[in-house]
Design a protein with these regions (language model features):
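A short glycine-rich, Lys/Arg-flanked "PGG" loop and its adjoining helix->strand segment in the class I
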Residues: 1-10
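Conserved class I S-adenosyl-L-methionine
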Residues: 10-42
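Ligand-binding pocket scaffold of soluble enzyme catalytic domains
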Residues: 13, 130, 136
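Active-site capping/gating segments
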Residues: 36-58
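Short alpha-helix
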Residues: 57-74
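A structural signal for well-ordered alpha-helical scaffolds and beta->alpha junctions
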Residues: 59-63, 115, 119, 136
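Core SAM-dependent methyltransferase catalytic element
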Residues: 74-75, 96, 135-146
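C-terminal helical/coil "lid" or tail adjacent to the Rossmann-like core of SAM-dependent
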Residues: 79-132
Length: 146
């Protein structure tokens, strides 16, 4: 990106996959969701995850590490914010179809079975906890090419 943008060009991104993306009050949802998904995976698909090593996509950087990474590539950060967003079930169901998320969450499992299990587990967790949304922090960053 730094080689593509001319000096003064803007680079903007956001992510909820950073250290700090999960709020303490949402941890129960994540635990229930993953527990239920793993159970569904075993019962309905006869599969289990292969937890040999943490998948690279699951290694979250801190907001400061993202900043350092951007600055190391000849950018000046002009805006860095963390916004809390209330994510409804549709957001979690959508992410349950995203390959990088699936591979990071249920490593070694065929994508279709993993996605199915994640979606069913999400429905069960939302229902059991009587949720309409789960709060999630998003890191927003805007940087200018030096």
């Amino acid at each position: 990106i730094s080689k593509t943008l001319k000096p003064g060009g803007k680079f903007a991104f956001n992510t909820s996959f950073f250290e700090g993306g999960q709020l303490p009050e949402s941890l129960l949802f994540y635990r229930k969701w993953m527990f239920k998904s793993a159970r569904i995976l075993r019962k309905e698909h006869g599969l289990s995850t292969q937890r040999t090593a943490k998948v690279e996509s699951r290694k979250h950087l801190t907001a400061e590490q993202y900043r350092e990474l951007v600055e190391r590539h000849n950018f000046t950060v002009v805006k860095q914010e963390i916004d809390t967003v209330n994510v409804p079930i549709d957001g979690w169901l959508d992410i349950s179809t995203f390959e990088d998320f699936i591979v990071g969450t249920l490593p070694g499992v065929p994508l279709d079975a993993a996605s199915d299990s994640l979606q069913k587990g999400c429905h069960q967790a939302f229902e059991e906890l009587n949720l309409t949304y789960v709060p999630r922090n998003w890191l927003d960053m805007v940087a200018v090419r030096a």
